[in-house]
Amino acid sequence: MPPVPRTGPGYTWHLLRKWWFVTSFFRFFLACFLGFAAPAWVGAAAPAPIFVLNSLDGTVSVIDPATWQEFKRIPTGKEPHHLYMTPDEKSVIVANALSDSLTFIDPRTAEIQRTVRDILDPYHLRFSPDMKWFVTAANRLNHVDIYRWDGKDMHLVKRIPTAKTPSHLWIDTKSTTVWSTMQDSDELVAIDLPTQTLKWRVKTGAMPADVFGTPDDKTVLVGLTGGEGVEVYDVTGKEGRLIKTLKTGKGAHSFRALGDGRHVLVSNRVANTISKIDYQKMEVVDRFPGPSGPDDMDISADGKFILLASRWAKKLTVIDMASRSVVRQINVGKSPHGVWTLDHAPRQ
């Protein structure tokens, strides 16, 4: 293994891991020889791994952020596209769209916990904030499924036919409404979660993909993969109303909030850029590089780095937001899509 550079984010993670080993030994010494538990600060946790879903390989690449090396590759099912953490934070669920299954993985050890089958075409997935509902979008089969979550298992309550190619989901903070984009019929639909009924549908621009709701539940943003920007909808009325279009770049696709309660990123897959949107002013305020078909993103816990799936290059790309530059690329599998780590910035 090549030596870890003595500068940059890799070296920082390296020092953190060394600190974890030293403090863990010290904690063990105190517990064994002094007969009492060490203070909580002594046992600082090691950095959690980074998970990258290789959609055309049917695997998950597991990256050690201390060395920026892939140390494990987990077989899942066919076409793992997206992943989501369980409400208790004990599992991250990988949705295998073409295998009709969910793979539960320990977010710290990267060990497979279990596989749940007969979940039809789980392309996208999401838990409601009240932790009672689990929702999937069937991209291939044209329906949205709503499951009741009991803390361990999901139970199908309603299968809702939608339109062509349900793509992404968002649930409001009150757990009352699910919004879903229809990629091939160019629509945004709203579903009432308590009654599992379709509330409204409106036409959008070309090939709507990811959807992001502002924290006040008044506005929804839709990325247009077939266009050059993001549509902004007022969702406070009886149906969604288009109020603005933000020009970001060709192939606007996936959102990730910065965690500061004000900004959200969107990847522009064709333009190979990432745009920063101020969702209070609804303006594009910054731009970052996004090489080789930028797709899903996560943000490091300190808010300094974008972790990006470069879809066409088979790489995880690390972007320093301060310098607006690519600082590292790690080889992964074919067509990387979802990317996630437990040590992330807040999602609003």
Residues covered by each model-derived region:
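Low-complexity, intrinsically disordered Ser/Thr/Pro- and acidic-rich segments
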Residues: 7-9, 27
